[in-house]
């Protein structure tokens, strides 16, 4: 009789091709996602050595990081470096025969939204991409993580990856969430508790009633930020919610293949008595709408709190807090709800899905953004954009004063035209608030879509629950 295994153990064991004496393993990779920024050198390496892509049918490419989100981008991209990278991906996809969603394709979008949307991401798979937020796909019970450019070339050439196994960590969210609290609040609260190094060396399995009650889109938000918590990957065991989401998608199994896959997927859970090296438990009812105040995702507090003083920290974190407050232009003791906002960004692979847009639109309906506010919504894919237009969400955003953009990574990172100016303060639904992340000397506060919408209306960080009470 075999020892009880975690979900991570099971997926890992099913993909080990070879294990060396020191524990280093060669893992088979089921899906390789590719974008324009981390792939050019990898494809060039294949050309120089005369190699082909080993499994083009399992390789999916889409430009997303530095594409403009304004009209006309399918015929002209002004930034030379961006244009060269997108053109290179066009050529590489054609030359190597991989699956490709170009800028002109309505299915184009952020790679971590396109993959699940098209049914490429399935339970029990190994998924890699030259991008740290590949952890998103763990919401399906897939082992998914980012890789470097040299590893991108290795996977393209061999469909395998060399790595050592991580340790097992469990994050359990018990009970149910209160109204106004979202998946974004869960994942930020976990990072706030454990720190950005709390998951280092681990693969996290998220579980508990609050996780089970999330939609697939909410689960993707939670797993998306596992990397911000230091983890190699994040996982959620697949269940009926997962299966219902996957069924009928373009690249999901059909007929007898579906039944066979479903039979396997139902074995993907952590066995009773399986060992975790680290366990963190949070009560769902204790989680509130949160916002980051500093320059690390762990600098997070409930929206009802005040800006902390550096003296509240210890060790090296005292100076880090002092630097964060200086960069963010904040004073200890001020209410978070008194922090004025210049810009609101709703989008990214964390919160650019249709449910995120619905949540924001519900707050914005019939309202206008604050005078002088710059606000934009960037759907995570062309299909999300089309659905939002069909549901009337786009018109709500436009009527409120938001810019309604094309799909892409946009203001999540300063690699395209959507950037903050020095000193500009943004309430953002993205995943990182590092110095300069959204533009040189820009200031980022990470929030949920509803919180972002509330800030757009009032002009300052706002408790979304107050807005929800007004709409009842």
From Swiss-Prot:
Enzyme Commission code(s) on record: 4.2.1.33
Entry's cofactor comment: Binds 1 [4Fe-4S] cluster per subunit.
GO biological process, one term: L-leucine biosynthetic process
Keyword Lyase on entry: yes
InterPro entries listed in its UniProt record: 3-IsopropMal_deHydase_lsu (IPR004430), Acnase/IPM_dHydase_lsu_aba_1/3 (IPR015931), Acoase/IPM_deHydtase_lsu_aba (IPR001030), Aconitase_4Fe-4S_BS (IPR018136), Aconitase_4Fe-4S_dom (IPR036008), IPM_dehydratase_rel_enz (IPR050067), IPMI_cat (IPR033941)
Pathway linked to the protein: Amino-acid biosynthesis; L-leucine biosynthesis; L-leucine from 3-methyl-2-oxobutanoate: step 2/4
Entries under PROSITE patterns matching the protein: ACONITASE_1, ACONITASE_2
Keyword Transit peptide attached: no
Catalytic activity: (2R,3S)-3-isopropylmalate = (2S)-2-isopropylmalate
Residue sites binding [4Fe-4S] cluster per the record: 349, 409, 412
Keywords noted in UniProt: 4Fe-4S, Amino-acid biosynthesis, Branched-chain amino acid biosynthesis, Iron, Iron-sulfur, Leucine biosynthesis, Lyase, Metal-binding
Cofactor(s) it depends on: [4Fe-4S] cluster
GO molecular function ontology, one term from the record: metal ion binding
Family: Belongs to the aconitase/IPM isomerase family. LeuC type 1 subfamily.
Function field: Catalyzes the isomerization between 2-isopropylmalate and 3-isopropylmalate, via the formation of 2-isopropylmaleate.
Self-association and partners: Heterodimer of LeuC and LeuD.
PANTHER family: 3-ISOPROPYLMALATE DEHYDRATASE (PTHR43822:SF9), HOMOACONITASE, MITOCHONDRIAL-RELATED (PTHR43822)
Name of the protein described by the UniProt record: 3-isopropylmalate dehydratase large subunit
Species assigned in the record: Cereibacter sphaeroides (strain ATCC 17025 / ATH 2.4.3) (Rhodobacter sphaeroides)
Gene: leuC
